[in-house]
């Protein structure tokens, strides 16, 4: 029986007690290690400029939508019909030379990696599930659309639009934000 369940019966089992104690010790050790590493990094950080440019911008992009017409789990091809276009909200926060792109949906990692590659700024990152929730579901990168994973099957976006729209949209916001001094 799972020792984490309420009212578990193995509570008096010495093997379970030993394993639970080991888990507590490991969690404590990891916490101490993390705390020491944070202190080490903090000591090495040079104080930066006190006045850096700060800017924010937002826009929407729209991509063709789809509606799934069959049921099934991962591993089986989905069938779809055309649906209303899906709006995706994009944002950007600039703090000095750091660019933080934002998307209001859960974006596959290759899209964020592409943004970082194409960004003219060395310090570029992407946050997701930001500024509300898109009705898109997951947003796969173009290459992933051929895979029958739950995330791809459940996406309400047709292939071939969202990846480029997101990357180009955030790069456009960077162009706007770079003019702020």
Predicted segment positions?
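Non-catalytic substrate/cofactor recognition surfaces at enzyme active-site rims
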Residues: 1-181
């Amino acid at each position: 029986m799972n020792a984490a369940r309420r009212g578990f019966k193995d509570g008096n089992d010495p093997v379970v007690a030993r394993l639970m104690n080991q888990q507590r010790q490991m969690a404590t050790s990891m916490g101490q290690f993390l705390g020491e590493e944070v202190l080490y990094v903090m000591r090495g950080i040079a104080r930066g400029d006190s006045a850096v440019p700060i800017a924010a911008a937002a826009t929407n992009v729209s991509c063709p939508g789809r509606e799934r017409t069959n049921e099934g789990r991962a591993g089986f091809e989905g069938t779809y019909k055309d649906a209303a276009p899906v709006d995706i909200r994009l944002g950007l926060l600039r703090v000095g030379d750091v660019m933080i792109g934002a998307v209001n949906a859960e974006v596959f990692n290759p899209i964020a990696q592409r943004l970082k590659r194409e960004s003219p700024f060395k310090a570029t990152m992407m946050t997701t599930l930001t500024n509300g929730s898109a009705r898109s579901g997951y947003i796969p990168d173009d290459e992933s659309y051929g895979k029958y994973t739950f995330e791809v099957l459940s996406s309400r976006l047709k292939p071939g639009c969202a990846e480029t729209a997101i990357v180009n949209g955030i790069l456009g916001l960077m162009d706007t934000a770079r003019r702020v001094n």
